[in-house]
Each structure stands twice: as C-alpha cells, then as structure tokens.
C-alpha cells in the first residue's frame, strides 16, 4: 500500500463506502474545475469556512490540516498559498496523525457540513443538482484509475469509488452528514489563533 493511498483506510474503517461505483454519464453533474459549472462542489472551490474563529479559504485546506497535530506542518499548510494538498505531502510521512485512517471520512463529513452550513451558494447548488448524480470527474488525471474520491469516464459511464460525490449526494438528500471525531481532532486550531 502506498503511504498516500486511502483505499485500505476506507476498506478497513469505512466498509460502507468501499468499492467501485458505475453511473450513466448522461445522468451526472461532474465536478471538474472550480471555474466550471458545479465547481463549487469541489473542495478547492473558494467557499471560506470559519471554525472556532479561524478562517479557511477552502474546505480542502481545512481537511488537509485535520491530518496534523503539530505546529510546524499546521502553520506551513495554513499560510502557504496555492494547493494545500501539495504542501501536505511534504509533511505527511513524518507528522500525519496516527489515527488518520480511522477518521478520514468523518473529517471530510465535518468539512462538507461546515461548508453546507456556512455557504448559501453551496446549498443552492446542491438543491439545483437534485435528481442528478454528483461525481468528481478525474478523467483527465494521468494515473490509470481514479483515486478514492472520484471517477473516470469509461465508455458512457463514470466508474470509480466516487466518495466525494456520494457524500455530497448524502448531504443534499438528508441535509446533514453524521460524523464522529476524536476529542483532539481540532488541536491544530490553537496554532492558528
């Protein structure tokens, strides 16, 4: 298993979200780029989130920071402009939470819930997507298969785990996501206040 792969985490800790899905492409709204239609669904979309008085420019930055408890990586990721995922990779091998695999989906559910509660535009777009399947389209990625969050187009279907799309549809259809995070899930915030 690659240190950065989350597939084993999902299979072991979140079996209800494990496995490949297939969706007819003509029934899907696709998350592809933040400046395209449905781009607000991307975790990289600029929908600021405030948690305990700390503002995050994107839900992706908040999610990436939840991987850490130590001051140095937290400050580096928070203050570095651009893609927080790339900055995070630098710190993960030496500083990632030991229990990250056990909380990864709950952390994403928290981030999406905050985005839902704090962004009217996000809620409106979720409502507008009713009746459609939401997918994170990774067809343009160079690797053969999509990662756990997305799908790739194969003939007339989007195929892949589609975790992000599935969580967004669950949030859209129920108005909430249930999550369970450890007491120390937000210790990183103390370095940002």
Question: PLM features: residue spans?
Answer:
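Charged, low-complexity intrinsically disordered segments
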Residues: 2-193
């Amino acid at each position: 298993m690659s240190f950065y792969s989350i597939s084993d985490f999902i299979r072991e800790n979140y079996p209800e979200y494990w496995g490949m899905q297939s969706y007819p492409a003509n029934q899907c709204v696709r998350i592809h780029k933040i400046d395209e239609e449905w781009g607000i669904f991307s975790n990289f979309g600029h929908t600021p989130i405030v948690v305990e008085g700390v503002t995050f420019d994107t839900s992706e930055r908040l999610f990436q920071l939840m991987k850490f408890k130590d001051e140095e990586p937290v400050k580096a990721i928070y203050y570095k402009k651009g893609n927080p995922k790339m900055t995070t990779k630098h710190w993960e091998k030496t500083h990632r939470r030991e229990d990250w695999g056990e909380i990864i989906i709950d952390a994403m559910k928290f981030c999406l819930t905050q985005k839902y509660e704090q962004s009217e535009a996000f809620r409106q777009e979720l409502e507008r997507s009713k009746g459609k399947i939401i997918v994170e389209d990774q067809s343009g990625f160079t690797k053969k298969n999509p990662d756990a969050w997305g799908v790739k187009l194969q003939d007339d279907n989007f195929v892949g785990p589609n975790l992000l799309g599935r969580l967004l549809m669950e949030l859209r259809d129920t108005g909430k996501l249930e999550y369970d995070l450890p007491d120390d899930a937000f210790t990183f915030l103390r370095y940002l206040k």
